[in-house]
Regions:
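Conserved polar/disulfide-associated segments of primarily extracytoplasmic proteins
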Residues: 53-153
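Bacterial N-terminal signal peptides that target proteins for export
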Residues: 2-11
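Bacterial N-terminal signal peptides
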Residues: 11-20
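Solvent-exposed, polar/charged alpha-helical surfaces in well-ordered, non-transmembrane soluble domains
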Residues: 42, 46, 86, 90, ...
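Short, solvent-exposed mixed-charge patches
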Residues: 165-167
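N-terminal "mature-domain start" segment
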Residues: 26-56
Length: 167
């Protein structure tokens, strides 16, 4: 049987690197928040993000990374136009701009994700409809491609903990 010590070493190095990034995300102190108006829940690592001035829209929260060009937005609004998840996704792609390089777009009955590249940034946007599609909730984050190893596990955890409020 032929062995490949260099291949094993590289495989072990990749596994160790991935584990280190995941454990860093797990060790950080996470802030858990609930929006008072719409009741959605979100979380973020305290060491990575800090609140920044917002535009005064109720139900929205803006954060920026302390030592990076990463940005994080979470918000919700009343779906007065009665948009469906598919209609709103189509509207975002056709009107909001920056969706030329979509690499990931899973969807469910009441939610969808758009993720991809905008220049040197990776974006991840999850939209969830709640309360019989009366409320639209969004989590959006963008971060430098060069910092993917640091942010990918963080985004995974943020996405897992993002939830809609009760109706």
């Amino acid at each position: 049987m032929r062995t490949y010590p260099l291949r094993r070493f590289l495989l072990a190095l990749v596994a160790l690197s991935a584990f280190s990034c995941l454990s860093l995300a797990a060790k950080e102190r996470w802030i858990e928040q609930r929006d008072p108006q719409f009741g959605y829940n979100y979380s973020y690592p305290e060491a990575l993000f800090a609140s920044v001035a917002d535009d005064g829209k109720p139900g929205f929260h803006y954060l920026a990374a302390n030592a990076s060009d990463a940005k994080f937005l979470v918000g919700a609004w009343d779906n007065r136009d009665g948009a469906t998840p598919e209609h709103f996704k189509r509207w975002m792609i056709e009107n909001a701009g920056g969706y030329e390089e979509i690499t990931y777009q899973p969807r469910g009955r009441s939610w969808f994700v758009l993720s991809g590249y905008r220049g040197d940034q990776i974006y991840y946007e999850k939209v969830m409809f709640s309360c019989g599609e009366r409320v639209v909730n969004i989590l959006a984050i963008a971060y430098p491609v060069a910092e993917r190893d640091q942010f990918d596990p963080v985004v995974e955890r943020m996405e897992d903990r993002f939830s809609t409020g009760e109706c």
